[in-house]
Amino acid sequence: MDHDVRHPVHPPRSANTLRTLLAVALAGSVAACTTTPTAPPAVELPAATIDHLDLDHWWTEFDEPALTALVDEALANNLDLQAAMARIESARAQVELAQADLYPLVTIGADASRSRSTQVGTNPLPPGFAATGNDYRLGLNASYEVDLWGKYRTSTRAAQNDLLASEFGRETVRTSVAAEVARAYFGLIAADAQLRLLQDTLALREQTVALQTDRAQAGVIGQYDLAQAKAERDSVAGDIATAQRAANELESALAVLTGRSPRDVFTPHVGREPSLAKLLAVPSVPSGLPSNLLERRPDVRQLEKQIVAASLRIDRAHLDFLPSLTLTGTLGTESGTLRRLFSGPAFIWSAAAGLVEPLLIVKSLEANVDIAVAQREQIAVGYRQTVQAAFKDVHDALAANDTTRAALAAQTSRTANLQQAYDLSDVRYKAGYSPYLEVLDAQRQLLQAQTQQILAARDVRLALVDLAKALGGGWDYQNAVGTTADAK
């Protein structure tokens, strides 16, 4: 009796292998289809005190045409800015390189070969066929990896955000250059004012020495008073040399900042408006904590774009776990003789498609993900540090703006009082009521007060420069590239 015994049908081993590969691919797809947040880390911010600031060209608020001309010259020729522009061009080329992966790779090739085959080997030539022959080939070769999962689109977006970051980096350099030019300019104006004060004082001391010499020769005063007068004259002459050195250094610094030639740096001549009255005048610049400080600061915006780019690179590293589909094709001619290379029967073509899933390189792919995550974390930490520094800069600059103005007011009052004291001591000395040492002491204190007044006026302007820079002034942040066209 026959029994109909049904045995289980086992799928072939190749089918099991295919299922395993598909399962791995599916698992990789699930793991890779995550999206990394591109927003910068959250930070606690202080309350804003003002809503609007117009500081795009803050240096014009000082009403110093010479300063405006120097800043314009620096923004056109400064070497740090030129280096920043070169970095932008490099980032732009990286975008083009990333975009190239989105298109097929097409090459043209020509080959010529000569070979000999055996008639007695494993695959012998049939009788009558030549053992030696030529082969000529000419054709187009194309390959294209289909961007199924958006790998190359993600790489392109990352490169675009790098480009935006480099553009904000240029604006960071721009704001720094403008501030450094202004600081050097006001330092130079103060040095000029000190020089004029010292030169005027030296002229008075020379007159005093001449007068005291005559009085000593007449026996009215002794050699002690004459020696004191000469010592005071020499002290002022030494101060003039020191002030001149400071002015020379500031002139050469401005020559470097404005991108002038080494010859001009060695023999600089910087146009300026040396006016003590203008230096002592306190300009009015709006101050406070703007509500859009983080938008105004190009260094913060630069790191925001770097965070976006780093997040996209994490996504790109995850997408490498997914299978890739590559299409290849060839179109051309092939013949054993050159004269028949372009005839009808010589035409050849081929087309192929391949699906590849990474298996044995998973460890390296995981390492790439870890590297990308660590790089994003580094940038995120840098972002938090930069935000901290931004608010510290504003806090310190606002405080300096108040304290330097108070110091200038005090020094101005002190100078006026010491001027009165000097005038009285001079009258008393000439009337014979006080020794010459009292006059010298009054002169010395007055000169010191006048010098401190000049430095206090300089510090007021330097504080305003620092405040404008801290508030993100010096660039057109509202119309900056990347503000409305983010590549996220």
Regions flagged by a language model, labelled:
Residues 262, 281-282, 431, 452-488:
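Acidic, low-complexity, intrinsically disordered peripheral segments
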Residues 82-83, 99, 146-174, 224, ...:
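Sec/SRP-type N-terminal targeting helices
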Residues 168-289, 400, 404, 424, ...:
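Periplasmic alpha-helical coiled-coil/stalk elements that build and connect Gram-negative outer-membrane
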Residues 53-62, 111-141, 264-286, 315, ...:
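Small/polar, glycine/serine/threonine/aspartate-rich low-complexity segments that form flexible
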Residues 52, 60, 69, 75, ...:
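Amphipathic alpha-helical coiled-coil scaffold segments and their short linker/junction regions
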Residues 4-21:
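Bacterial N-terminal signal peptides that target proteins for export
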Residues 34-96, 278-308, 358-359, 384-387, ...:
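Bacterial Sec-pathway N-terminal export signals of envelope proteins
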Residues 29-32:
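C-terminal motif of bacterial Sec signal peptides marking the signal peptidase cleavage site
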